[in-house]
């Protein structure tokens, strides 16, 4: 079954909470998603929330990570990072776990297929994204990204050929696309701006996938300013 378009819900970005901010009324029955507007890991869960139409059910709590409040570690997440989800009296962290949790525990269109072959391939891709893909591309910034990332981007290109019933990794839009897009979004901007390397050249499936993702308001509302991405990623060079 095709994913139904989520309701259009335009949100104003609230000022992030910092070291001077009081905490929200924790565990008062409100479901809260603690994020940073610029964190790709948090963006995964933010996109999932939006695609499932949960803007009313899950309240965003933006955090200023460079000047984060002490209560983030003391009262919310002992790891002192985002994303973190406050739901049913407990806190859950780690982005790949959270996108599955939100998909399974809240109403809205399912973002993971029932088909066993697709689920198996999806799990392979979810393992690859953080363990190999992200590390490989970040590691290339000190060397030659064109050579050092070719296998990683080719892996993505080939994965997008696996199923022919849609332009996404598993055919239809799924959690796998949500896991990859925050990083590919940033890598595309940074590699083009700094190294003049356009990752979609010679990769038509990747190009088509990015084009489709950019048609989704639920995703585009979460994107990070390109200038910020370039300046932030330069620290890894």
Swiss-Prot record:
Keyword annotations for this protein, in alphabetical order, are:
Cytoplasm, Detoxification, Stress response, Transferase
Spell out the coiled coil positions from the record: none
Task of the protein: Catalyzes the glutathione-dependent reduction of S-glutathionylquercetin to quercetin. In vitro, possesses glutathione-dependent thiol transferase activity toward 2-hydroxyethyl disulfide (HED).
Q: Domain named GST C-terminal: which ranges? A: 112-232
Protein family = Belongs to the GST superfamily. Lambda family.
Q: A Gene Ontology CC term for this entry?
A: cytosol
Q: What is its main location?
A: cytoplasm
For this entry, list what GO says about its biological process: protein glutathionylation; response to toxic substance
Q: Name one GO molecular function term.
A: glutathione transferase activity
- Lineage, top-rank taxon, reads Eukaryota
Query: Which residues are recorded as binding glutathione?
Result: 39-40, 67-68, 81-82, 94-95
**Is Transferase included in the keywords of this UniProt record?**
yes
Q: Which Pfam families match?
A: GST_C_2, GST_N_3
Q: Where in the cell is it found?
A: Cytoplasm, Cytosol
Which Gene3D superfamilies is this protein grouped with? 1.20.1050.10, Glutaredoxin
Q: What is this protein called?
A: Glutathione S-transferase L1
Per its record, what triggers expression of this gene product? Answer: By glutathione, ascorbate and auxin.
Q: What is its EC number?
A: 2.5.1.18
Task: Look up keyword Hydrolase and say if it applies.
Answer: no
Q: What class of enzyme is it?
A: transferase
Q: Where is the GST N-terminal domain?
A: 29-110
Segments passing through the bilayer: none
What organism does the record attribute this protein to?
Answer: Arabidopsis thaliana
Q: Which reaction does it catalyse?
A: RX + glutathione = an S-substituted glutathione + a halide anion + H(+)
Q: Supply the PROSITE patterns for this chain.
A: GST_CTER, GST_NTER
């Amino acid at each position: 079954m095709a994913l139904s378009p989520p309701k259009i819900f335009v949100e104003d970005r609230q000022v992030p909470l910092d070291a001077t901010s009081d905490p929200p009324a924790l565990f008062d029955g409100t479901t809260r998603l603690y994020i940073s507007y610029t964190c790709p890991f948090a963006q995964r869960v933010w996109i999932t929330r939006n695609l499932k139409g949960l803007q009313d059910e899950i309240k965003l709590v933006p955090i200023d990570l460079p000047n984060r409040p002490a209560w983030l570690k003391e009262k919310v997440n002992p790891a002192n990072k985002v994303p973190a989800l406050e739901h049913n009296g407990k806190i859950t962290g780690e982005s790949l776990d959270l996108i599955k949790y939100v998909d399974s525990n809240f109403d809205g269109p399912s973002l993971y297929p029932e088909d066993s072959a697709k689920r198996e391939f999806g799990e392979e891709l979810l393992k690859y994204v953080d363990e190999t893909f992200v590390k490989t591309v970040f590691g290339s910034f000190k060397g030659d990204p064109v050579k050092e990332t070719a296998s990683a981007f080719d892996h993505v290109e080939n994965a997008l050929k696996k199923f022919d019933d849609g332009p996404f990794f598993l055919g239809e839009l799924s959690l796998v696309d949500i896991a990859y897009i925050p990083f590919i979004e940033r890598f595309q901007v940074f590699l083009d701006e700094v190294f003049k390397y356009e990752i979609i050249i010679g990769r038509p499936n990747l190009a088509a996938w990015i084009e489709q993702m950019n048609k989704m308001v639920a995703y585009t509302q979460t994107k990070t300013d390109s200038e910020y991405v370039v300046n932030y990623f330069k620290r890894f060079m």
